[in-house]
Amino acid sequence: FFVVSCVKPSISFLPEFNQIDLLIENGFIIDGSGKEAFPSDIVIVQDRIVFVGKTKFTNDDYKYRIIKKIDGDNRFITPGFIDLHSHGNPLETPSMENFLAMGVTTITLGQDGSSPAVQDLSKWMDQVSEKGIGVNLAMFVGHGTLRNLSGIGRSNLINDSKMSGMLDTLNETLKYTFGLSTGLEYNPGLNASLEELIELAKI
């Protein structure tokens, strides 16, 4: 629910702000460090967590304007989960609500050796950015896709020219992706030799 109120905290924090965009109160935080959940409030300003702790606001306080307040109702509050093996098309389903519904806020795409079949993956990523996406995205380039783009496909034999082309494409793509993914049980990746994989790994 949305509320607009003016409060002044009984403890000193956030001296540089006069407005709190979101205040989550009365929750139990699991921070991922391994320690037990602890009672706390969370203060968010301009989409950033700026304070974690008990704010101890009172009805007579008035310093900060709170735009939105959520009662945690003694429920658990956790960081967003990272899905290390995801599949999806953000150009078709940019909201990614299926991930958000499970608490996932970061996904990885380009798994199993398959990424969008475009020579310049950065342009595809620009399209995703322009369209907007509901989660954070860590993008990988697929080994099988590189084989197809280089004209190697399912072949067991690779000449120097095509191998060089694949390595050049990988080298360029790694400038803006998180790495190379493989799917060696799928075509065309299952046709790769150990020597090919070693050369790719060197990049």
Question: Where are the language model's segments positioned?
Answer:
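Glycine- and other small-residue-rich loops at beta-strand/loop junctions that grip anionic moieties
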Residues: G189
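Divalent-metal coordination cores built from histidine and acidic residues
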Residues: G72-I77, F81, G88, E92-T182, ...
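Histidine-rich, glycine-flanked metal-binding segment
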Residues: F13-L22, I29-P79
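Active-site-proximal loop/hinge segments that shape catalytic or ion-binding/gating pockets
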Residues: S193
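Active-site metal-binding loops of divalent metal-dependent hydrolases
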Residues: G27, S86
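Flexible loop residues that form catalytic
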Residues: G32, D112, E185
